[in-house]
């Protein structure tokens, strides 16, 4: 999935991108841990929020796959998130085989 394919109120599956910016994780009043940033790919940029176990897991410049998440409109912008039960992992692009 690419950023230009995102639609509000839809699931996000296997979105691959690079973390352009990433704020420090913080705790919101409900006690949940959240970390915000900007994810980019060759088609654009989107705000991203990592929640709970996914917050604090990555650093700026990491390539990630948002394997299970959601997309919504937040402050008039598209935003993707792991939500409470989503999953994001670090992505290592396949390297060409040496001959």
Please report, for each region that a protein language model flagged, where it lies by residue.
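Short beta-strand segments
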Residues: 15, 44-48, 78
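OB-fold (S1/OB) nucleic-acid-binding surfaces
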Residues: 22-48
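A general secondary-structure signal for short beta-strands and their flanking turns/coil
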Residues: 10-12, 32-34, 63
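N-terminal leader/targeting segments and the first structural element of proteins
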Residues: 7-8, 18-20, 24
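Hydrophobic core residues within well-ordered beta-strands of beta-rich domains
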Residues: 13-15, 19, 64-65
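OB-fold single-stranded nucleic acid-binding module
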Residues: 23-31, 53-99
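Short boundary/loop segments of OB/S1/cold-shock single-stranded nucleic-acid-binding domains
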Residues: 1-11
């Amino acid at each position: 999935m690419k950023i230009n394919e995102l639609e509000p109120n839809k699931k996000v599956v296997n979105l691959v991108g690079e973390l352009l910016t990433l704020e420090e994780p913080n705790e919101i009043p409900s006690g949940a841990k959240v970390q915000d940033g900007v994810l980019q790919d060759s088609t654009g940029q989107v705000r991203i929020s990592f929640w709970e176990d996914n917050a604090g897991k990555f650093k700026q410049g990491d390539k990630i796959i948002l394997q299970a998440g959601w997309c919504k409109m937040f402050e008039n912008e598209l935003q993707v998130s792991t939500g409470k039960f989503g999953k994001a992992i670090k992505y290592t692009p396949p390297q060409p085989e040496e001959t």
